[in-house]
Amino acid sequence: TELLHDSIKHNFKGFEVHCQPQVYADSGFIKGGEALLRWKCDEYGPVSPVEFIPILEKTGMIAPVGKWVFDESVRICAKCIKYNPDFKMSINVSYVQLLDDSFLSFIDKSMHRHGVLAKNIIVEFTESCFIEERGIVFEAFENIRKKGIKIAMDDFGTGYSSLEVLKEVPADIVKIDRAFVKNIRTSNFDRTFIKFVVELCHDVGIEVCLE
């Protein structure tokens, strides 16, 4: 915890945002990218996000780090749209960030600062957003969508990401968890599950992304 705090205090030293490409399944052309947070600790070297992100969320440090990640991701997006105006950057947002009253205005300021349009940004959320305070979370998502930013449900098929949540949440994109994708060639269940979710989403106007 102290090492994370020191990194934040020293202008987010050791933190980096990597961009993982997202491609169209039919053509292989790049559609956009997902912003991935990485941290290299001075004392222990690279630390897995599985280890440090829960600590950030538990301690509340995710608020400043989340804003830094969002702004850095928008900055990277601004560079990408110079080559592809339709490039879309997907940025993960935590439950804690959605409870921050200043976060929505921060989104506007970040996009304005880097000259990025709402159509180029996608906000992703995970199951942690639905542990409690659903009303506040859903309202935040609606306000984000009103800006013209699309909402993506991450890790669908695991944890709290159920059909019930899909029905309630104003999601524009569903990302099927890699647990169902990695064995798609050998698992009949995984193929059937993916086919079902894809057809269901397309029938109601929701895009699908396979991780």
Segment roles from a protein language model:
Residues 1, 66, 100-103, 107, ...:
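The cytosolic transmitter module of two-component sensor histidine kinases
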Residues 1-55, 92, 153, 210:
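Active-site core of bacterial EAL-family cyclic-dinucleotide phosphodiesterase domains
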Residues 3, 51, 55, 72, ...:
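Cyclic nucleotide signaling catalytic output domains
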Residues 24-34, 61-137, 211:
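Catalytic core of bacterial c-di-GMP phosphodiesterases, primarily the EAL and HD-GYP domains
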Residues 45-49, 58, 153-166, 190:
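Catalytic-site-adjacent helices and loops of nucleotide signaling machinery
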Residues 53-54, 63, 138, 142:
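Conserved long alpha-helical elements within nucleotide-processing catalytic cores of c-di-GMP signaling
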Residues 110-184, 198-211:
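The catalytic core of metal-dependent phosphodiesterases that act on cyclic dinucleotides
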